[in-house]
Amino acid sequence: MSELLHTLTRESLAQYFDHTQLAASATEADIEALCRESLENRFKMVAINPVQVPLCSRLLHGSGVHVGAAVGFPLGQNTIEEKVFSAGQSIENGAQEIDYVINITALKSKDYAYLEREMAALVAVCREQGAICKVIFENCYLTGDEKRAMCEIALAVGPDFVKTSTGFGSGGATLDDVRLMKRQVGDKIKVKAAGGIRTLDSALQMIEAGAERIGSSASVKILGEFCRLRQE
């Protein structure tokens, strides 16, 4: 088990987590439970779809737990204007963070100028309203060169985070991808790992590889595992 098991506290580990509920079948009760769990465990953020932002904003107001909206999710196949509108509306409704999916078609077509315009537009709407911007690559569909190209665009534009995955693609976060992204962006941009992170060991490995945020729907389970091991 990682050395982090002994250096992290319950509180510091909890702050890595964006506690996630993005299922199309999620009920209002599910969203309320997500917020309640995040308050109880002091997670950094709840990750939800834009339609859930007003409810989460009301439930979490003044708590310090951020509300994060997923934009262009999960396919990224929206126009720049649609993504900007969704991000702006989500922020107006109370979101403090935006996780948006890139246009993967543009990347596969090597239309880097489009991707830079898209990223700049999303970063701008977030900056204007004081929100954090995270860029989801969806690495399971990308080659190494494509991942590196997106990191270079991010370095030019300056979002707050680059993120591995939606959790809805054919694969989630991998240690190799987190390491690649961290090598490319260094300390200038943070890395978020998401997708398939369901155990404490997996989460700690992602943190050791360079992730500064973890997106997971298993955050409560992971934190509970940490607490049990620290007591043994």
Regions found by a protein language model. Name each.
Residues 2-41, 45, 53-58, 62-73, ...:
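Alpha/beta enzyme core
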Residues 194:
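Short hydrophobic "strand-cap" motifs at the C-terminus of beta-strands
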